[in-house]
Structures are given as structure tokens and as C-alpha cells.
Amino acid sequence: PLWGQSQDPLNEDQTTVRILEGDNSDPSIVRYGKSYYLVHSSFVYTPGLVVYKSDDLVNWVPCSTALTTFTGDIWAPDIVFHNKRFYIYFPTLNGKGKKTNMVTWADTPEGPWSTPVDLKIGGIDPEHVVGEDGKRYLLLSSGALYPLSDDGCSITGEPVRIYKEWEIPEEWDIEGVSMEGLNVKKVGEYYY
């Protein structure tokens, strides 16, 4: 389930509220007007990438489905609003074992959503980033920063590695070697 907190976490009287039932891992939220829109991993379920709407971050209702046909095993999507259009970037593992990242877009979060476009790059946890120059990029958990076309629907060049995966000692029993669940925001002159 996806959980929310209705009190200050340091307050002894805190209350935890379940806001969505089921497996809702890797949520991504965007605010548009007075409403919030959320997508989460949909894995192999079809329809996939259900878009939820909320005006209070507690009560959510489905408002559209970005994928109406099977696209593959989908996880860790990133929903963004840029230049008057909504985009969902997502990694997928198709039925033949190929990993790639795709994008679908719509003029409103209620859809209709476009047929997904294959960006032809592997990696997980895509994060849409806009540089100081207004150019668009897609950052992956490996630290690869790919330049995007102006419309955000194709990769236009080779990636720049902005950080490298961690060097893990061989004797450690660990699964991950890079950051996951990226969320990059610019505050002042720095990106966080």
C-alpha cells in the first residue's frame, strides 16, 4: 500500500493513513493547478500506468490509464509537466528480456495518452531534468544523463556520467551499486 502521514512525524500522536490499496511502489507525483497527479509501478498489469488525481494528497481517484496495451514489466515511472504537456518516462522489460526506457505524453492528465515511444536506452529510475539552458535531459540511476530532444521524445546524443556507481567490496553481500528513486530539483543555483 501507499502510505501517508497526517501528523508531524516527531509528534507522539501521529497517525498513518493508507492512501492507496495494493502494490503501489515507486510513486511519482506532479502538481498541476490545485490538483496532484500520481503514477506508480504497474509491473505486468494491463492497462498500465494508472494516473490518480487528488486535491489533498490523501484521497486519490483514478483519472486515466496511460497504457492500454501490454508494453512490458513497468516500474519506477516519472510523471512531469513541461511546456504545456504531461509526460511519463518509464523503464520496461519487454516479453523478450529487453530493457529499455519509454515515454508517453498527453495534453491533460486525463488523457488520451500517446502510444509509447521507445527511447532505446537501458537503465532504471528515469528522472526528467531541465538544465539552466532550458534543455531537457533524462537522468538514470547509473548516473547517465542523456540529452533529450526539445519534444522530450528521443535521445539526441551520448550520455554524460554525472556520478559513477559505487565501488562495493567483493566480500559485501549487496544488490545495488547506484542510487535509486532519483528526484532532482533546482533550488537557487544548486541541483539537489
Question: Which residues make up each language-model segment?
Answer:
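Carbohydrate-active catalytic/glycan-binding domains of CAZyme proteins
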Residues: 2-192
